[in-house]
Amino acid sequence: MKFEKGRVFDVAHMIDYAEGGVVSKELSHNDAGSVTLFSFDAGQQLSEHTAPFDALLQVVEGEMELSVEGKVNVVKAGEAFVIPNGARHSVSAAKPFKMII
């Protein structure tokens, strides 16, 4: 499901949780980059990795634990975080959460 340009949409309701899993939905993709919506069930994680560009993420439901260069940050619904390019980062879900990045 893609979002309609020029329309208001509810990001949190565009994706469901999968029991014991992570779900991703690419909402937009072009030469400048992409926008992806994720849902993480409790206990799930994304292992440490880097990206060659800054990444802005916003939690749209729940809260996540985001480790950036070894520092753990708790990011809650409505809050955002910019991950600097090249920074080692990982994600974990103590509770279910949804984010857009």
Annotate each predicted stretch with a short phrase.
Residues 20-21, 36-51:
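Conserved short histidine dyad/triad with adjacent acidic residue
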Residues 85-101:
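Ligand-binding loop in jelly-roll beta-barrel domains
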Residues 1-32, 67:
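A short, N-terminal "cap"/entry segment at the start of jelly-roll beta-barrel domains
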Residues 39-41, 51-66:
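Short, conserved beta-strand element in jelly-roll/cupin
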Residues 70-85:
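Short acidic-glycine-tyrosine-enriched beta hairpin
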Residues 60-61, 76-77, 95:
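A cytosolic small-molecule/anion-sensing beta-strand core signal
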